[in-house]
């Protein structure tokens, strides 16, 4: 089966909901559904998607550098990547002033180079590696999976959690060792030498996480998140899903996709609110002032300062983008969850338009 084809692809699938049909045809726009049972091509697709994401990050960073105006506040220029790099302490001097754009250029270039490496990996997995890892030899065979195999899905979940944990740990190392973070309270970049390790303080933010105003607490929270993610990753790699989990969860491609989309939707809603109101992780100097919620055709976050017509702060762009993307991810979660449970949307179409039956 080709990774991309102009003609429909036929898949005999136990992973996706087929409503009893043995052969289901997917056109090119169906994406990963075309090779849902080909574990090798599934990896190729994900590596290619990672390459595109990293390429966008690198290219857009360089684009924002070309558009940056030092005489205007960064938060009022509609930038979305440079503010993140500034918050991490790159190229920032006293008072939150950008004193050096070169670190941003390096980061953009590194992302472009990384995207090329990932793209090469995607091409390798597409054209040279086995399309079905069950036929592979050596360690590669270990990453073959079936959608109805909870043990193997748990191993893959474990590896995902490890990468997320290492990502959280990298932020901790950046804050405590590699140059520090920008402190919006002091308007300077500093090392976080005494992160909060009291679990009661960290857990206390469960009810008001968006009000956090201490970098020590922020970094301490990431330490706990890193520990939990890495420990969870090791657990899922070594321990198959327990009996209660096997009974509670559904193990098929449609259900796994719905779980993933639901998790992304939750993260998106949380990020939207956090970005809209928090000025520690999203300093006013780089993102503009906090937003207010307004209601139009749909809820949205609005700027609280006067800007020229059609212009918005970085905070407004990010908060609204996260909110609306999370909303559509939530719809995808519900769609695939219902399909996983056997709901046939074509029956709904027939119910609403009886003429279809004829």
Curated annotation (Swiss-Prot):
The subunit structure is:
Under iron-starvation forms a complex with PSI trimers, where the trimer is surrounded by a ring composed of 18 IsiA subunits.
Which InterPro entries does the annotation name? PS_antenna-like (IPR000932), PS_II_antenna-like_sf (IPR036001)
Gene Ontology cellular component list: photosystem I; plasma membrane-derived thylakoid membrane
- Keywords carried by this UniProt record: Chlorophyll, Chromophore, Membrane, Photosynthesis, Photosystem I, Stress response, Thylakoid, Transmembrane, Transmembrane helix
Q: Where in the cell is it found?
A: Cellular thylakoid membrane
* Family per record: Belongs to the PsbB/PsbC family. IsiA/Pcb subfamily.
Q: What induces it?
A: By iron stress.
GO biological process terms, alphabetically, are: photosynthetic electron transport chain
The answer to whether UniProt assigns keyword Transmembrane helix to this entry is yes
Keyword Transmembrane belongs to the record = yes
Instruction: Give the top-rank taxon of the lineage listed in the UniProt record for this protein.
Output: Bacteria
Q: Which SUPFAM superfamilies match?
A: Photosystem II antenna protein-like
Q: One Pfam family, please name it.
A: PSII
- Role played: Functions as an antenna for photosystem I (PSI) under iron-limiting conditions, when phycobilisomes disappear. In the (PSI)3(Isi3)18 complex most of the harvested energy is probably used by PSI; in other PSI-containing supercomplexes a large part of the energy will probably not be used for light harvesting, but rather is dissipated to protect the organism from light damage.
| UniProt source species | Thermosynechococcus vestitus (strain NIES-2133 / IAM M-273 / BP-1)
**Disulfide pairs?**
none
The cofactor binding remark recorded in the entry reads: Chlorophyll a.
What's the protein's topology in the membrane?
Multi-pass membrane protein
- Cofactors that this protein relies on: chlorophyll a; all-trans-beta-carotene
Output this protein's name. Answer: Iron stress-induced chlorophyll-binding protein
Q: What is its main location?
A: membrane
Question: Care to name a GO molecular-function term for this sequence?
Answer: chlorophyll binding
Could you list the residue ranges that cross the membrane?
40-60, 79-99, 104-124, 219-239, 255-275, 318-338
């Amino acid at each position: 089966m080709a990774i991309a084809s102009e003609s429909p692809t036929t898949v005999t699938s136990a992973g996706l909901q087929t409503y009893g049909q043995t052969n289901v045809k997917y056109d090119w726009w169906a994406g990963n559904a075309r090779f849902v049972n080909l574990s090798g091509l599934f990896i190729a697709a994900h590596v290619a998607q990672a390459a595109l994401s990293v390429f966008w990050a690198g290219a857009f960073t360089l684009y924002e550098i070309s558009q940056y105006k030092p005489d205007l506040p960064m938060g009022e220029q509609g930038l979305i990547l440079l503010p993140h790099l500034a918050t991490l302490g790159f190229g920032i001097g006293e008072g939150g002033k950008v004193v050096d754009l070169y670190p941003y250029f390096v980061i953009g270039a590194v992302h472009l180079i990384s995207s090329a490496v990932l793209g090469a990996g995607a091409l390798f997995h597409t054209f040279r590696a086995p399309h079905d890892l069950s036929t592979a030899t050596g360690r590669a065979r270990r990453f073959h999976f079936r959608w109805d195999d909870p043990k193997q899905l748990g191993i893959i979940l474990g590896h995902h959690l490890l990468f997320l944990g290492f990502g959280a740990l990298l932020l901790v190392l950046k804050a405590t060792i590699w140059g520090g973070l920008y402190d919006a309270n002091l308007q300077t970049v500093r090392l976080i030498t005494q992160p909060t390790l009291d679990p009661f303080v960290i857990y206390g933010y469960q009810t008001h996480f968006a009000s956090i105003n201490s970098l020590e607490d922020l970094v301490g929270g990431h330490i706990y998140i890193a520990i939990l993610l890495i420990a969870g990753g090791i657990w899922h790699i070594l321990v198959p899903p327990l009996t209660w989990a096997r009974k509670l969860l559904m193990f098929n491609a449609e259900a796994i996709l719905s779980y993933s989309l639901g998790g992304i939707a939750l993260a998106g809603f949380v990020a939207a609110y956090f970005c809209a109101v928090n000025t520690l992780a999203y300093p006013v100097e780089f993102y503009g002032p906090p937003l207010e919620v307004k209601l139009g055709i749909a809820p949205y976050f609005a700027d609280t300062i006067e800007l020229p017509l059609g212009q918005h702060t970085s905070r407004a762009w990010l908060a609204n983008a996260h909110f609306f993307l999370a909303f559509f991810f939530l719809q995808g979660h519900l769609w695939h969850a219902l399909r996983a449970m056997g709901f046939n949307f074509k029956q709904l179409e027939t119910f609403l338009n009886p003429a279809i039956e004829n």
